């Protein structure tokens, strides 16, 4: 059935659902203290506070010299890196356009593309000591499906980190609860000395997201 063949009443119900959903989102944004704080402090997104909180707990940015930001748009995480590690070389990538950030090299391309890893490494001019991934697949509202789609991105990010990180380096990634994390954690524990997970206060309570923090990269076999 084409869109034009739909019952007008059905179209109206769908429109009402979209309107209600948009209204809830807008209300949440307007009443979110992190959104207000981000705007007041000049951060591009409330997500900046997630990295700030993770860094305060795990010391991720101390001594960072080369940092990769996977899923950089709109740029909040790279802003934090730039402020806390001003001497670090920062490279980010995202399918979505990202406004320039001083001192940050940004690639507007798909991280899953074959040429992406080489482009990132070439821009860094050396192995990264921190790989950040705030990537998430477009959600469909079904927790298990959203989890699996995002896990595909996370697994690719882990592979990139293991192939490129300097010994002693760290990896941070967003995941969604869903019960298929066992293999991911096993790979991380094999390659890093410590692997922990955290849900920073800036993560919304009703969100199933959490972050995996892997530190002390053991290095690649010779």
Curated annotation (Swiss-Prot):
Q: Which UniProt keywords apply?
A: Cytoplasm, Methyltransferase, rRNA processing, S-adenosyl-L-methionine, Transferase
Under Pfam families, the record lists: FtsJ
Q: Name one GO cellular component term.
A: cytoplasm
Q: What residues bind S-adenosyl-L-methionine, as annotated?
A: 75, 77, 94, 110, 134
Superkingdom per UniProt: Bacteria
Q: What is this enzyme's EC?
A: 2.1.1.166
PANTHER family per the UniProt record, alphabetical:
RIBOSOMAL RNA METHYLTRANSFERASE, RRNA METHYLTRANSFERASE 2, MITOCHONDRIAL
The protein's role, per its UniProt record: Specifically methylates the uridine in position 2552 of 23S rRNA at the 2'-O position of the ribose in the fully assembled 50S ribosomal subunit.
The UniProt similarity line reads: Belongs to the class I-like SAM-binding methyltransferase superfamily. RNA methyltransferase RlmE family.
This chain belongs to the protein called: Ribosomal RNA large subunit methyltransferase E
The gene that this protein is the product of is: rlmE
